[in-house]
């Protein structure tokens, strides 16, 4: 008489596991956000779904060392190693922020063997928007 209720949880779990394992993206987008305190590297597919990510903090750097170029290089290497294993060959790079890790992260990306279509600077620049914070007096 009554229809059986499908188990949503089991279907959802199988869908997530199949997405994680069978993820082959030959082209992707690498987002590098370099602030003065940290560098975050996120690798997405062309639709914007995150495939891999890493930051200087997750690589074991704490405190002021997270903002260093070496920490950014390590974070970029960790994020890209995972997607190269999944078969990514080409990528576009979007760099955002004024941090020290911009060039180091780009150097690590170039050394990884991924062919870069283009490198774009997407740092947000205000057209005289909000008032900046006051200058520090030390």
Curated annotation (Swiss-Prot):
| GO cellular component entries | chloroplast; ribonucleoprotein complex; ribosome
HAMAP family given for it? Ribosomal_uS11 (MF_01310)
Q: Which residues cross the membrane?
A: none
Q: Which GO terms describe its biological process?
A: translation
Superkingdom, natural source: Eukaryota
Return the Pfam families for the record.
Answer: Ribosomal_S11
For this chain, the family text in UniProt reads: Belongs to the universal ribosomal protein uS11 family.
Protein name, as recorded: Small ribosomal subunit protein uS11c
Biased segments, Basic residues type: 9-22
Disulfide bridge partners, by residue number = none
Query: What keywords sit in the KW lines?
Result: Chloroplast, Plastid, Ribonucleoprotein, Ribosomal protein, RNA-binding, rRNA-binding
Annotated localization: Plastid, Chloroplast
Which lineage ranks, top first, belong to the organism behind this chain? Eukaryota, Viridiplantae, Streptophyta, Embryophyta, Tracheophyta
Q: Which NCBIfam families match?
A: PRK05309.1, uS11_bact
MF terms in GO: rRNA binding; structural constituent of ribosome
| Subunit field text | Part of the 30S ribosomal subunit.
The organism encoding this protein is Nymphaea alba
Looking at the record, which segments are called Disordered? 1-22
Q: What is its main location?
A: plastid
Check the record and name the SUPFAM superfamilies matching this protein: Translational machinery components (SSF53137)
């Amino acid at each position: 008489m009554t229809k059986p209720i499908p188990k949503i949880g089991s279907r959802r779990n199988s869908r997530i596991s199949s997405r994680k394992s069978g993820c082959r993206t030959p082209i992707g987008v690498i987002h590098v956000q370099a602030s003065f305190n940290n560098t975050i590297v996120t690798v997405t597919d062309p639709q914007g779904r995150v495939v891999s990510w890493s930051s200087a903090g997750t690589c074991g750097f704490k405190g002021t060392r997270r903002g260093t170029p070496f920490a950014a290089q390590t974070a970029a290497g960790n994020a890209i190693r995972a997607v190269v294993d999944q078969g990514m060959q080409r990528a576009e790079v979007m760099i955002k922020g004024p941090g020290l890790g911009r060039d180091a992260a780009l150097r690590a990306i170039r050394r990884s063997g991924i062919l870069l279509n283009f490198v774009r600077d997407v740092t947000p620049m205000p057209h005289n928007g909000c008032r900046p914070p006051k200058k520090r007096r030390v």
